[in-house]
Amino acid sequence: MKKQDFLFIFVLVIIFLPFFVSESIYDWYKSFNAAHGMVMSFIKFGILATLGEMLGLRISAGVYNRKGFGVLPRAVVWGLLGMGINAAMIIFSKGVPQFMEYMGMANAVAIINGEFCLDKLWIALTISVAMNTIFAPVFMTFHKITDTHILMCGGSLKSCLLYTSPSPRDGLLSR
């Protein structure tokens, strides 16, 4: 392990340690998360998914960051994607049981909110299949587009926001 690996582990410990050592911090986190789900989705995805991408870069290239990788733009994009994922979870977890009732399943909404049973498992599986077939392809396409955009902008947040696509007269598209 290199020095950067110990630093990465140290950052993870600093992020998660307060939740284990302080009941009041953990209680505050749970109440803030319940009251401000979208804000917390942005923060959690922004931090954790970006750390995951950095870990992936470490595995594939041997470093946690490099020129053009764009840690900050990736964190912003992941934060926005996290908000979309949160919205999709809400929409599908509420909408699919309603749709199942519309299609003839009795009490799907009550079942998904009740004790575990095989019908609840069936509803949960249906929610998962619906979300992964309807939402996931759009999500993955958008994520690929944003990754490409970040790389095209050299990983700079300012460049990502002010980037204009090349015009055919620039000669960039004909190469």
Locations of regions flagged by a protein language model:
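Transmembrane alpha-helix/helix-exit interface in multi-pass inner-membrane proteins
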Residues: G82-M103, S128-S156
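Loop-to-helix transition at the N-terminal end of transmembrane alpha-helices
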Residues: F32-A49
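Membrane-interface helix termini and inter-helical loops of multi-pass transporters
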Residues: Y26-N33, F99-Y102
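Hydrophobic/aromatic-rich structural module bridging two neighboring secondary-structure elements via a short loop
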Residues: A61-A87
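Conserved small/polar residues in nucleotide/adenosyl-binding loops
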Residues: Y163-D170
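Alpha-helical transmembrane segments of multi-pass membrane proteins
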Residues: V11-Y26
